[in-house]
Amino acid sequence: MIYTLSGPQHIDTTIQLPPSKSISNRALIIQALANGNLVPRHLSDCDDTKVIVEALKTRSETIDIKAAGTAMRFLAAYLSVREGEHVLTGTDRMKQRPIGVLVDALRYLGADIQYEGEVGYPPLRIKGHPLAGGFIEIPGNVSSQFISALLLIGPMLEKGLELKLTDEIISRPYIDLTLCMMRDFGAIADWTDVDTIRVAAKAYSARDYYIESDWTASSYWYEIMALADDSEAVVRLEGLMDGSKQGDSVVKYIFSLLGIKTSFKTTAPGVPNIVTLHRHKCLLPRLEYDFTGSPDLAQTVVVTCVNMNIKFHFKGLSTLRIKETDRIEALKTELRKLGFVLQSVGDDELLWDGERCQPSDEPIKTYEDHRMALAFAPVALKRQGLQINNPEVVSKSYPDYWKDLQTAGFTL
């Protein structure tokens, strides 16, 4: 399938953003560990969350999580402490995404996990049973989902969990989100040092829980505002929380540098806000930023900057190599189609010094990566008739994206 997109001349729209995928997935695992029958309210209906919902209900031995990386990591830990034997598998791409660090850590804690194929990669055969827990060290520069997976089962371990993170800690806001949610459900879990987290052996308590909207999803609307030629453009986003624990709420700061002003309208404490985005003049010639804490925003900001003719040097991108695709190479390849030549430095850095090439009319390839489609679609404001391959991939995190774009006046 190919969508051909064109952007509107004027934007004045109100969008109900999807529930947070990150919060939904954590809440489901915690509620299951609490043996609660309560389903979190305002739960995400994206593919990744649906996979976890089905996995927690299934009686089948084989659990296919498809392309859901979060589900693979969280369920590997969850199934390790639940009685029963399961095979956890996924797509061909999922079988290429390393999971050895998490498996080694779970085995160290006493888990019974075997590789069904290549060592260090899914599928996994897991025989669940009670684990002793205790002290463990793992690198801090691995996917934060490995760390969150271990933390989530910490209260279920006989000795609790003391987790020391060596090396630089990446995506720390996601770790903090996990700890905050664990405490919301009665766990005793916190940092005891700059590199050490302690989780007590105290069971979760099931409770009613509301899922706020997704700050990562808001980033595509910030991009739309930044790329719109309409100086009077207005976008209102419903469901976001001011002071959110979502690490990607930093998007409001990043885009303030790119000329987008964020205003909150709060009706009552603890109630989701209406966030209004306005444009002001951006005079920034170059942007430098470290995405270590918010790598999922990188594609959005990269695509925005080149289309605003803002040079950049971005760091903290190492985890982009092992996402749904190699996002660094995918960005370089697809932006070249639009006439921009990017350079990568090692596995961690991406820069654009203003170099251009002859653009082509080739459709944008999405590489089975939802964030490629999500980040490139707003370019239709600058390039009418932009074509995007396999647009259905957005269902992984933002199922109503195309409908919401049409609400805002895009044609497809």
Functional labels for PLM-detected ranges:
Residues 1-412:
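Short, structured segments at the rim of ligand-binding sites
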